[in-house]
């Protein structure tokens, strides 16, 4: 029993971490298949040992949390997730299961929709006017994004009267839908982002999520966001709604809410399989990204009888598409130095296109991955985009290996600064120990410091930082605040207008929360959540710098490893001097705490 309990705890911990990255950080760490498989494994163990089920388990809840930057909105009707399937026999089992529960012998009708890869939102209308918009959050509490939603043209601020059927507009109407960015608009957005010297978005979903959660609605207004309605969650009007989910969607369209053109009312599970196959064949030609289809029992009366679990409804499923796989030749493997000195092998490929995305390189993460694959330069490999987001080398195609392949030589010295490399974890991880003396670490540290979630200095992208560091204009993060017009005139292709905009952005960044300032320092292991907790507990940066190891270890979200990193960060003379320089009254940074 002890072993089972430990196994369950381990699965929960891993799933929560992945959920945090996906819902809060907008990062897909693993493929949907891997996540769903692990969630199912946990679910099976909890079914066998029901006394070990906890309310906080990923099987019982959704993984997002509302952020402190936004006002919280409580969902009267929870915004649930969907259970996923990947095979036809699972759909047949679903059909059989609901017929048994409903005591139904007839052919079931299903409303089938596209599973658009975007961000779920809830819109509340009263007497036809938009009152508020909220994100999913954890399913019970979301973020108020009304001002940002108001900038999306596809979202009507006022509903139009459906004179043919319902006459007056409903007193209350709560809509559920998806905010997304089309493929073409995403490419254009990234083109503009790169031209501005900023890091491009990794995928359209992340871009949509980040755009929707901007603190400044004027930024959201510049992003090409779209919206489709996929359901009604709450209604109060003179006439009753039709029982058919499909008819309700047609009614939403009559009220001015956009719905997707590929929604179909289908009779029988075999026809649903045909719909799945059809959508799979046209997937690449669609104007937006999808990762499967959604299948809903069409009768809303049946939906009520089938009910919902704590995490997902029992009357709907997401039938996911398998990740696309292609092959490519490995031209080279370069070792890249990150912000903390970790050296990562990057495989450079002959460019290939998977799901409309051109892939030129793949992060191999560590030396063990190179060894596991038995990879050599010149090999042909199979590439998969995990969750249609992260490219990954699945295997080496040994049958295509030639005599011209080369062994990957592991570096003994830092490829950037030449310092000796240290290894740990059975030599699977390589690290340059030169710190800010290493040009790569210095640039990456500065990139992190000025990033949107840190100091948010708009206009200081990677290319600008490269020039500033290469010309010796900045060395530490405090040097950013010593930049002036004369220094910036030295930069190539940087005119007076850009200089003035950057200097304004630097000045604007000086009023910042303590949490974001702590995060900006780049302490190894200190993400946004830990930084926020440290700010609430210690109140000032001076208190945090003076904190002892024991008090740090006792904090929520801070284990012994992160506590040790924080403690030693402030005991490093260079780090301490940089922090003292940053909070020097001459620079004028104003730190405040949000409780």
From Swiss-Prot:
Example GO BP: DNA repair
CDD domains, alphabetized: LIGANc (cd00114)
KW NAD (keyword) present: yes
Residues that coordinate or bind NAD(+): 32-36, 81-82, 113, 136, 178, 296, 320
Cofactor(s) named in the record: Mg(2+); Mn(2+)
Keyword field: DNA damage, DNA repair, DNA replication, Ligase, Magnesium, Manganese, Metal-binding, NAD, Zinc
Any Pfam family hit: DNA_ligase_OB
Keyword Manganese: yes
Cysteines joined through disulfide linkages: none
Catalysed transformations (reactions): NAD(+) + (deoxyribonucleotide)n-3'-hydroxyl + 5'-phospho-(deoxyribonucleotide)m = (deoxyribonucleotide)n+m + AMP + beta-nicotinamide D-nucleotide
E.C. code: 6.5.1.2
Top-level taxon in the UniProt lineage: Bacteria
Residues annotated to bind Zn(2+): 414, 417, 432, 438
GO molecular function ontology, one term from the record: DNA ligase (NAD+) activity
GO cellular component: cytosol
Active-site residues, Swiss-Prot/TrEMBL: 115 (n6-amp-lysine intermediate)
Top EC class for this record: ligase
InterPro entries recorded: DisA/LigA_HHH, DNA_ligase, DNA_ligase_AS, DNAligase_adenylation, DNAligase_N, NA-bd_OB-fold, NAD_DNA_ligase_OB, RuvA_2-like
Family: Belongs to the NAD-dependent DNA ligase family. LigA subfamily.
Record's function text: DNA ligase that catalyzes the formation of phosphodiester linkages between 5'-phosphoryl and 3'-hydroxyl groups in double-stranded DNA using NAD as a coenzyme and as the energy source for the reaction. It is essential for DNA replication and repair of damaged DNA.
The name this protein goes by in its record: DNA ligase
Species for this entry: Blochmanniella pennsylvanica (strain BPEN)
């Amino acid at each position: 029993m002890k072993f089972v309990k430990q196994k369950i705890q381990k699965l929960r911990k891993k799933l929560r971490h992945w959920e945090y990255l996906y819902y809060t950080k907008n990062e897909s760490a693993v493929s949907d298949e891997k996540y769903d498989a692990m969630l199912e494994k946990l679910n099976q163990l909890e079914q066998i040992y029901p006394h070990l089920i906890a309310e906080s388990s990923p099987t019982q809840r959704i993984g997002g949390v509302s952020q402190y930057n936004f006002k919280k909105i409580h969902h009267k009707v929870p915004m649930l997730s969907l259970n996923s399937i990947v095979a036809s026999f699972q759909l047949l089992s679903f059909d059989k299961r609901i017929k048994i529960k409903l005591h139904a012998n007839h052919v079931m009708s299903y409303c089938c929709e596209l599973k658009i890869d975007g961000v779920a939102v809830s819109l509340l209308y009263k007497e036809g006017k938009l009152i508020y918009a909220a994100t999913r959050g954890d399913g019970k509490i979301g973020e108020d994004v009304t001002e940002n939603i108001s900038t999306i043209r596809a979202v009507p601020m006022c509903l139009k009267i459906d004179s043919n059927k319902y006459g007056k507009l409903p007193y209350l109407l709560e809509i559920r839908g998806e905010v997304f960015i089309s493929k073409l608009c995403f490419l254009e957005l990234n083109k503009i982002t790169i031209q501005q010297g900023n890091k491009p978005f990794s995928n359209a979903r992340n871009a949509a999520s980040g755009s929707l959660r901007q603190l400044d609605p004027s930024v959201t207004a510049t992003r090409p966001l779209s919206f489709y309605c996929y359901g009604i969650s709450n209604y109060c009007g003179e006439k009753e709604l039709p029982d058919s989910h499909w008819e309700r969607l047609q009614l939403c369209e009559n009220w001015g809410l956009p719905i997707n053109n590929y929604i179909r009312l289908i009779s029988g599970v075999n026809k649903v399989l045909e719909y799945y196959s059809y959508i799979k064949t046209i997937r690449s030609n669609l104007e937006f990204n999808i990762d499967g289809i959604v299948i809903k029992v069409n009768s809303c009366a049946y939906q009520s009888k089938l009910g919902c679990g704590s995490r997902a409804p029992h009357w709907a499923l997401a039938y996911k598409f398998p990740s696309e796989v292609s092959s490519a030749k490995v031209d080279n493997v370069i070792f890249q130095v990150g912000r903390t000195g970790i050296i990562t092998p990057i495989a450079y490929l002959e460019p290939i296109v998977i799901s409309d995305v051109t892939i030129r390189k793949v992060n191999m993460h560590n030396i063990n991955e190179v060894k596991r694959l038995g990879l050599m330069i010149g090999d042909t490999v199979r590439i998969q985009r995990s969750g249609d987001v992260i490219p990954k080398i699945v295997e080496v195609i040994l049958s295509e290996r030639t005599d011209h392949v080369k062994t990957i030589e592991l570096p003994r010295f830092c490829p950037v600064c030449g310092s000796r490399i240290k290894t740990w974890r059975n030599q699977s991880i390589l690290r340059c120990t030169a710190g800010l003396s290493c040009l790569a670490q210095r640039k990456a540290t500065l990139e992190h410091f000025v990033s949107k979630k840190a100091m948010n200095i708009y206009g200081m992208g990677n290319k600008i930082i490269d020039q500033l560091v290469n010309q010796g204009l900045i060395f530490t993060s405090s040097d950013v605040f010593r930049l002036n017009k004369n220094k910036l005139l030295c930069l190539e292709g940087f005119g007076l207008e850009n200089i003035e905009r950057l200097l304004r952005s630097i000045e604007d960044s000086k009023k910042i929360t303590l949490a974001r300032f702590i995060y900006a320092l780049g302490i190894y292991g200190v993400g946004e959540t830990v930084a926020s907790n440290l700010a609430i507990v210690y109140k000032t940066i001076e208190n945090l710098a003076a904190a002892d190891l024991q008090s740090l270890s006792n904090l929520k979200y801070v284990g012994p490893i992160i506590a040790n990193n924080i403690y030693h960060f402030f005991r490093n003379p260079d780090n301490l001097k940089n922090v003292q320089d940053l909070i020097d009254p001459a620079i004028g940074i104003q730190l405040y705490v949000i409780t």
